[in-house]
Amino acid sequence: MRGLRPALSTFIFLLLITGGVYPLLTTALGQWWFPWQANGSLIREGDTVRGSALIGQNFTGNGYFHGRPSATAEMPYNPQASGGSNLAVSNPELDKLIAARVAALRAANPDASANVPVELVTASASGLDNNITPQAAAWQIPRVAKARNLSVEQLTQLIAKYSQQPLVKYIGQPVVNIVELNLALDKLDE
């Protein structure tokens, strides 16, 4: 029985530290130092939440830039079912899926170049990716320009404005946040 008391007191102490003090401390510090990020990086217009800067959305209309395909279950960009398709590179089903995506993109973008950017046909590991390269966004300019009656130059400038450089120049590549880019497109129409 003597050995039980130190074990039990250690258990209670660690439970309070790891189950109470540590989570409360990290939450408080996160809210203090990074309030926007700690609350989901929500994009707001007035009192309305339009999306998150971290999670893609299913933009399908011709007047919107399309992001990476989503591999989430039940519906595209379902944050509760985050994950990749789990299809191996050697799986013939993946080849069929990519071929179908390429055909659909070529049909929706007849004025674009023949080479479809790879990130427009392959899902990310999370299935929720909201970023594509500026080149993939530029590939879609003819379709978006035609649907919105905007010039290629206007859309090129918009892509450049919403392009984000990597934190370290030689690691990574520039990306465009599709949610922010499409919300900016909607503001042009207002």
From Swiss-Prot:
Transmembrane regions listed in the UniProt entry: 10-30
Topological relation to the membrane, as annotated: Single-pass membrane protein
Pfam family, one: KdpC
Keyword Transmembrane: yes
Family: Belongs to the KdpC family.
HAMAP family to which the protein is assigned, alphabetical: KdpC
Name assigned to this protein: Potassium-transporting ATPase KdpC subunit
